[in-house]
């Protein structure tokens, strides 16, 4: 499913944060035309797809875009993950969208390479964590050399420690499926005390 409202509202799909976190606005326009085009691309590959003309933007979109385009002057839409959270299905989803790679469209796999809420250090201290390091090193190797191994990400070292649930990792699979080529490592640092990495496909 993708958003398709021409002026999406805000969805604050997080809990327990300061009041200011629920006053954020990002008034970027939607992009119904692209949503319809994506529907055609996915339908052509037999991937069930629908557009949601009511849903607004959640933090997976407005947080990164606020940093990149603070004036909210670009049209945007969101695509949801597939039910079942199957890694191969998300690689296939990306592959079905690969025709968009040659156009002036920015695709952000908005997630996190480490997402174990209980393991974060909310003070931000960088503490040694061998399991975290093992998984990040595996992810670097796979994304910069042989992205097809993402299909078996659960077999990676400390996979379920770093991702008790995979919804913050699977956006990476969609991007890798679109590009089908090695990525460039563009971020390798600490967030909330845990090492995290990010990649660019161009």
Tell where the protein language model's regions lie, with residue ranges.
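Short hydrophobic/aromatic-rich motifs at helix boundaries and adjacent loops
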Residues: 7-12, 69, 143-146
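Internal, conserved structured core segments that host functional sites
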Residues: 36-89
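Flexible, glycine/proline-enriched loop segments at strand-loop-helix junctions
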Residues: 21-29, 80-87, 159
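Catalytic beta-strand/loop module used to bind and position nucleotide/cofactor moieties
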Residues: 80, 97, 110
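Surface-exposed, charge/polar-rich loops and edge strands
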Residues: 40, 44, 74-75, 85, ...
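Short, basic/glycine-rich phosphate-binding loops at helix/coil junctions
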Residues: 13-18, 69-78, 149-151
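A short aromatic-anchored loop/beta-hairpin motif
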Residues: 1-49
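Short, solvent-exposed polar/charged micro-motifs at secondary-structure junctions
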Residues: 1, 60-64, 195-197
């Amino acid at each position: 499913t993708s958003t398709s409202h021409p002026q999406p509202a805000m969805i604050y799909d997080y809990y327990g944060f300061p009041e200011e976190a629920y006053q954020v606005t990002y008034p970027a326009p939607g992009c119904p035309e692209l949503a319809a085009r994506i529907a055609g691309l996915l339908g052509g590959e037999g991937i069930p797809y629908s557009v949601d003309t009511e849903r607004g933007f959640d933090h997976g979109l407005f947080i990164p875009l606020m940093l990149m385009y603070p004036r909210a002057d670009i049209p945007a839409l969101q695509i949801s993950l597939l039910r079942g959270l199957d890694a191969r299905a998300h690689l296939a989803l990306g592959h079905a969208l690969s025709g968009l790679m040659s156009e002036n469209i920015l695709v952000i796999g908005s997630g996190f390479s480490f997402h174990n809420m209980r393991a974060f250090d909310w003070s931000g201290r960088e503490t040694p964590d061998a399991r975290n390091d093992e998984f990040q090193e595996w992810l670097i190797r796979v994304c910069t050399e042989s992205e097809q191994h993402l299909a078996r990400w659960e077999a990676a070292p400390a996979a379920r420690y770093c991702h008790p649930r995979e919804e913050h990792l699977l956006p990476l699979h969609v991007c890798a499926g679109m590009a089908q080529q090695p990525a460039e490592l563009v971020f390798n640092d600490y967030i909330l005390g845990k090492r995290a990495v990010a990649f660019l496909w161009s």
